[in-house]
From Swiss-Prot:
Name of the protein this chain belongs to: RNA binding protein fox-1 homolog 1
GO biological process, one term: RNA splicing
Keyword terms: Cytoplasm, Methylation, mRNA processing, mRNA splicing, Nucleus, RNA-binding
Pfam families given in the database record: Fox-1_C, RRM_1
Molecular function terms from GO: mRNA binding
Organism name: Bos taurus (Bovine)
Length: 355
């Protein structure tokens, strides 16, 4: 009888030790389903009844309690290795909770296993890699191997205050560079220059503009030769037809129309040059005159035939792009504009048209 009591007492003490080991793990919730134990043994499992004999109590606790503890440690070790970031050790911030072993298999998808990068803004300027590692704790660096860890770090650290600065943790996205095309408010390819307030046309070409000064023979006003021709390569309008040329020749000077009469065509128009374009100023001072940017300047001495053709009066005539035009009517100051190009002339004329 004494031996039987000692054996029974020893079996009861041996059965109490595994119960104390199983209490921190709270294995009553998930250990029985893993080992296939029926549901009726789940409730009396932590507290065995005293009427059980030694032969039945000891094998039950020996076979049922220790294997769940070992499988639980293996599973927690696997979870810990899954959450470990390369180059850093995990801390209690990233340790799995009691409910994670049940939900972890559902979260381990292909998207969750891909690396994920977080963008942390508004952090102190003195922060370096050790500071970031200390701030993120067990999450390691900002670049995570597991997308679930990155999401958990973002939810935990977003909006926190570090040294008086509220940091923001968001998902880093790839920056896409796009070439935005400017909207042209004008039709037919005309473009507006906001600096000078002018409208440029893409259909202008670099033609030749002749500013002819024809002096009367024996005039005492000028001591220069009988005729000077000021030539400059300048963008002008292409004149494909007479109707279009007539429309452009009726350009306004200070709101007034000026008709240019043709005498003869000098040569065929040169090919278009897209780099240079004519310009129509919309400013009130210039009116709606048609101007052109200069590409080069040069002086040329005209032939005697050209000098004789322009020797009837003292005036400057604006010649269109592909033709030499002279105004046979009297040119007065009413139709003239101050020209900024008078410094390029050999001799200042009494009046001048602005090209």
């Amino acid at each position: 009888m004494n031996c039987e009591r000692e054996q029974l007492r020893g079996n009861q003490e041996a059965a109490a030790a595994p119960d104390t080991m199983a209490q921190p793990y709270a294995s009553a919730q998930f250990a029985p389903p893993q080992n296939g134990i029926p549901a009726e043994y789940t409730a009396p499992h932590p507290h065995p009844a005293p009427e059980y004999t030694g032969q039945t109590t000891v094998p039950e606790h020996t076979l049922n309690l220790y294997p769940p503890a070992q499988s639980h440690s293996e599973q927690s070790a696997a979870d810990t290795s899954a959450h470990t970031v390369s180059g850093t050790a995990t801390t209690d911030d990233s340790a799995p909770t009691d409910g994670q072993p049940q939900t972890q298999p559902s979260e381990n998808t292909e998207n969750k296993s891909q690396p994920k990068r977080l963008h942390v803004s508004n952090i102190p300027f003195r922060f370096r890699d050790p500071d970031l590692r200390q701030m993120f704790g067990g999450f390691g660096f900002v670049t995570f191997e597991n997308s679930a860890d990155a999401d958990r770090a973002r939810e935990k650290l977003h909006g926190t205050v570090v040294e008086g600065r509220k940091i923001e943790v968001n998902n880093a996205t790839a920056r896409v560079m796009t070439n935005k095309k400017t909207v042209n408010p004008y039709t037919n390819g005309w473009k507006l220059n906001p600096v000078v307030g002018a409208v440029y046309s893409p259909e202008f070409y670099a033609g030749t503009v002749l500013l002819c000064q024809a002096n009367q023979e024996g005039s005492s006003m000028y001591s220069a030769p009988s005729s000077l021709v000021y030539t400059s390569a300048m963008p002008g309008f292409p004149y494909p037809a007479a109707t279009a040329a007539a429309a452009y020749r009726g350009a306004h000077l200070r709101g007034r129309g000026r008709t240019v009469y043709n005498t003869f065509r000098a040569a065929a128009p040169p090919p278009p040059i897209p780099a240079y374009g004519g310009v129509v100023y919309q400013d009130g001072f210039y009116g709606a005159d048609i101007y052109g940017g200069y590409a080069a300047y040069r002086y040329a001495q005209p032939t005697p035939a050209t000098a004789a053709a322009y020797s009837d009066r003292n005036q400057f005539v604006f010649v269109a792009a592909d033709e030499i035009s002279c105004n046979t009517s009297a040119v007065t100051d009413e139709f003239m504009l101050p020209t900024p190009t008078t410094t390029h002339l050999l001799q200042p004329p009494p009046t001048a048209l602005v090209p």
